[in-house]
Amino acid sequence: MTATNSAIAAFPELQRLVDLREAGWSFLPVTDDDGELTELRGVRAWPGGFADALRVVYTTDAAGLRVDHMGCVVWQREGGLAEVVDGLLTLPGPETVGAPRLVLGRSPSGIWVP
């Protein structure tokens, strides 16, 4: 059994992160001063400057958003990991008719957008 399979067996919600990785997402672990993992951040860059971002603190504490080329939030969701990832995976690509484009607000300062 691989490390990924072992982790998913212990925490089935982690399969959702594997789904994102297979959809082209990149991830960055965030640690505290002692090297302990405090959260996981993920990003997927789109042509035209759009980007989707994910922050996971725990399986019940996650947030996702999409920003446009100006860093303005056009979609966001908070909740459990599965709920947020499902939202991100079903979100139409930015170039697709019906994709969110109406600005909801500015992205939080310090968000990692490639």
Regions found by a protein language model. Give the residues of each.
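Ribonuclease/tRNase effector modules and their secretory precursors
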Residues: 45, 57-60, 111-112
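Generic detector of bulky aromatic hydrophobic side chains
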Residues: 18, 25-28, 69, 73, ...
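Generic N-terminal initiation segments characterized by hydrophobic and/or small/turn-forming residues
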Residues: 14-17, 51, 86
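Generic preference for hydrophobic/aromatic residues in regular secondary structure cores
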Residues: 40-42, 54-56, 62-66, 90, ...
